[in-house]
């Protein structure tokens, strides 16, 4: 017997037979709204690592990143009833995380080594980790070394461009979703991502020493070219 979406999401004695790993994020949060704790546990399993990595790239403090990750997940649970499927669940989650980071940075604004998400001068730069590496390093270079090289390149991107860049290249959010997370105009989102890509290219090219780095650069350039062509159509 197959369960309908409404039967499963809103509760059924047969729901235990369904693997939560096969359920969409948006359906899981509806299950959380209906008091199903295991659905929340599945969302935590999916997002805790991503949130920690994303926040750590901004605050550069593992302890603080862990604290803000936990706070984000707590707010997801406590305010689950506020979610409506007018946006992807991931967009909602990263909006919560970004707002928490923004508030924390306001509180700690006198500490110059922490990234503030408030509007900043054009040349204000802060170090941030690079996009995730999906391929194993080759030609004798370790993953940690490769990550350090890409982190150095990403650190050359001013923070006002870096945040949209990471949301696009790391978290794979659409331009419209980044607009929702950051509160920027759509044209500004596109412009800042393009500028960030240019900064990344300029910074990474002198560091190219192996095929993995070259492949990462080519991936970003190909994606940028594809989006440019779409804009012209």
Which sequence ranges carry the predicted segments?
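C-terminal edge and immediately downstream basic/flexible tail or linker adjoining helix-turn-helix-like DNA-binding
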Residues: 2-11, 112-119, 149-152, 166, ...
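Acidic, proline/glycine-rich intrinsically disordered inter-domain spacer in sigma factors
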Residues: 13-19, 23, 123-152, 224-228
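Short, charged helix-capping/linker segments at alpha-helix termini
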Residues: 17-18, 33-42, 52-71, 186
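Short amphipathic alpha-helical boundary/capping segments
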Residues: 27-31, 149-158, 203
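Short helix-capping/turn signature of helix-turn-helix
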Residues: 46-49, 57-60, 166-173
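Structural recognition of an alpha-helix C-terminal capping motif at a helix-to-coil junction
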Residues: 53, 67-74, 87-99
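Arg/Lys-rich amphipathic alpha helix in sigma70-family domain 2
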Residues: 78-85, 95-116, 195, 204-206
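Helix-turn-helix DNA-binding module
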Residues: 151-188
């Amino acid at each position: 017997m197959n369960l309908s979406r409404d039967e499963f999401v809103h509760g059924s004695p047969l729901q235990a037979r369904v693997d939560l790993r096969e359920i969409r994020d948006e359906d899981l949060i509806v299950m959380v709204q209906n008091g199903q704790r295991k659905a929340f546990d599945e969302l935590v399993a999916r997002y805790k690592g991503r949130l920690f990595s994303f926040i750590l790239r901004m605050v550069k403090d593992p302890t603080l990143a862990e604290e803000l990750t936990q706070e984000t997940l707590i707010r997801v649970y406590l305010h689950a009833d506020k979610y409506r499927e007018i946006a992807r669940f991931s967009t909602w989650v990263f909006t919560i995380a970004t707002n928490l980071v923004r508030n924390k940075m306001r509180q700690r604004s006198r500490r110059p080594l922490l990234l503030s998400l408030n509007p900043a001068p054009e040349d204000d730069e802060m170090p941030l980790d690079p996009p995730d590496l999906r391929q194993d390093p080759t030609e004798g270079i370790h993953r940690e070394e490769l990550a350090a090289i890409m982190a150095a390149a990403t650190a050359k991107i001013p923070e006002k461009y870096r945040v949209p860049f990471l949301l696009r290249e790391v978290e794979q959010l659409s331009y419209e979703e980044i607009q929702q997370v950051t509160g920027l105009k759509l044209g500004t989102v596109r412009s800042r991502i393009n500028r960030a890509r240019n900064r990344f290219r300029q910074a990474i090219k002198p560091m190219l020493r192996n095929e993995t780095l070259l492949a990462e650069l080519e991936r970003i350039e190909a994606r940028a070219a594809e989006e440019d062509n779409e804009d012209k159509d």
